[in-house]
């Protein structure tokens, strides 16, 4: 606890000493010198049983002669920087303590001596002199607490000057007491906290405690100490409270104390359970204020102070991680313990591949010299060859510093790499932090970089030649530069071809859909593919005064939605046992669950993939969420209903299982959970009409989303609106802020990926990344992007996997989607709207031709690409069988929906409703 600068009284004349025995001040110094002072708590100085002398404090100083907390002030003149020590001996006004401060340049040493004699004479010896008879030396280092830590550099010790440290946080300490009632023990603890100047807040229930913690975190006023009444589990479940606090964001270093009955200390299982739940220390109940005060003092020094220091280390780790220089830390056996982000880029490896690796695995050079020098506490400085993953070695200047954390032998080695000037090009091509603003050097990093985007960032008059001379090392810049160099030394024909290539590279949307040529004699396929892959802008945006077909203001009806009986129906359970099989009968599940396939299948998938534990949520919350999501799928839709959602979710689960079995690019638990959630909600509240229809009818959703990705944006938005709108179904409520943000981003991205207008773009990117014959090495530059591509392709294939299902399921899905398209065409005719798919007329449409075109132009390439990645040959097998069947129907003249139903009766609940 610092105090304001003080002023010394005028110094006595040269050779004159004051009545306190002070040494004379230099005559060149001003009479009034600005001084810094440290307040010393009297609790640090134990009173002696023997009498001492009474010394009077300065008459005009700031010393305290009254009060129990302070024994006075020690004044230090920063101008005292002589080579030898000058001493200011000041008394505290107490009979038992003398405080001496020695100023040696910028180093200050403070000692406290206690008088042990009873002669009544004052001890005046310094730390460098001989003690007078009747006195003994007693040097006590001042262990300052955070609130006492001086902020001026003059109070740093010699070790701090050699190895500068970051001061720990220095806020006013706050304590939260969780007691079900304010009894005598609670009052004693409160008084002890107040004695040590802690700001105390008392709450009386778990809910009130958690609410207080959340509010304090929101206002950046966290509690440093939480004391929980653990004497009776009937009143407060201390174990549950402690565990909940530990899982609350921002409280992993909060000190938690449990007040227990004395009898608990005879039962180690009770105390161990509390400690395992996150309690730092268990203390026995007592109403003795002195005992509470001493116990609290120990906690402040032995737990809270170290926790503050530990929290400060995060600043150092963050600084290390963001350094452009490469930093490695190993143990004494040369096993890598830490690597920063620059190391990841240098070695072309992920951090989890680097940590715990032997250092010899990344160096080509012999490391014996380093080991020998570091054993003798000598630094190493030399050139070593670093082995990058899948690339040749690079000679680099390396400095190695041994550090002895415990004892005198080195426990860690710090490696610092300097990249030689000739090897700097590799660092510029690697991705930089995402948070870098667009237009900065760090933002120029993706393969889809468009040269023209530079113009929007203030370089409008920069030519391409000048651009390539800048230190912008994006891959597209290198490609253009290399092609320009090749063009200078090639024939005229080759130069013209390169010009065309350069022109394509300068365009936006390198992966934009390129429609394959469709036979002009196949108008149905033309209509279908055109409607799926073309944006709504090609249609007229005719205004209509008709009401929107989208329901608005629908409320969350949790209680009325969940089926009355959701017991373990043996038929349902037997069917769900095969829920990960590609032959799973989703239509049978639709029938036996009475139109609730998503609820039952969703709960089964959540259990199989441990989603409850991943989201840290109760099963009933997930059940309620699935029920609400399913209720917002419209039963009036023949295709885009909850059965389709359940089918996509089932396919997603099957794909995740296959990825796990192959141990290739395995998704983590959170990615699996978000993929299943996205699949379940990817078409929620679908109106049974296409985005083009909504745009043509001037629907409110089309206006809201500017005619762009209308339905998919609505599905993603309504998913989070429903989820966050009711705490009873909020499956994300126990996630921390960063995890929720990441999960939300993944779910939205996967739902938007189901939009067919970007089908070829996603497919082309996926093939360009995963289409190589050679196995792909892990690369931290692209792992995140490839994971995104993989998740997008996963849900895309799951969404349109109907032609790759067993034939009876494929035909039923074709019947349902055709019926939905027919209903849209009927409404377009009735409302005099542009006909999006004119050939989808129920009287004239050829279902086989539409499916043949869909497989040829959409499904075939995507299924082959996905199957080669995931290794599920049944996808191709079923697709070929179904394609042959549709060809056969077409040759037989089986075209209309009625004819198809006669050949292949509908299956599932929808069949019974016809």
Curated annotation (Swiss-Prot):
Q: What class of enzyme is it?
A: hydrolase
Q: Which cofactor does it need?
A: a divalent metal cation
Pfam family, any one:
PDE8A_N
| Residues covered by region (Disordered) | 1-27, 113-138
Where a divalent metal cation 1 is bound, by residue? Answer: 644, 682-683, 799
Q: Which Gene3D superfamilies match?
A: 3'5'-cyclic nucleotide phosphodiesterase, catalytic domain, 3.40.50.2300, PAS domain
The UniProt record lists the PDEase domain at 558-893
Write down the chemical reaction(s) this protein catalyses.
Answer: 3',5'-cyclic AMP + H2O = AMP + H(+)
Q: Which domain of life is it from?
A: Eukaryota
Coiled-coil intervals, chain numbering = none
Q: Which InterPro entries match?
A: HD/PDEase_dom, PAS, PAS-like_dom_sf, PDEase, PDEase_catalytic_dom, PDEase_catalytic_dom_sf
Upon gene disruption, the observed phenotype is: Basal levels of phosphorylated kinase p38a/ERK2 are decreased significantly. Increased sensitivity to oxidative stress-induced death.
* TM region positions: none
What positions does UniProt annotate as the active site of this protein?
Answer: 640 (proton donor)
Query: What SMART domains does UniProt report for this protein, alphabetically?
Result: HDc
The chain positions of domain PAS read 312-359
Q: In which pathway does it act?
A: Purine metabolism; 3',5'-cyclic AMP degradation; AMP from 3',5'-cyclic AMP: step 1/1
Entry keywords, A to Z: cAMP, Hydrolase, Metal-binding
- Tell me the GO molecular function terms: 3',5'-cyclic-AMP phosphodiesterase activity; 3',5'-cyclic-GMP phosphodiesterase activity; metal ion binding
Q: Which PANTHER family match?
A: CYCLIC NUCLEOTIDE PHOSPHODIESTERASE
Q: What is this protein called?
A: High affinity cAMP-specific and IBMX-insensitive 3',5'-cyclic phosphodiesterase 8
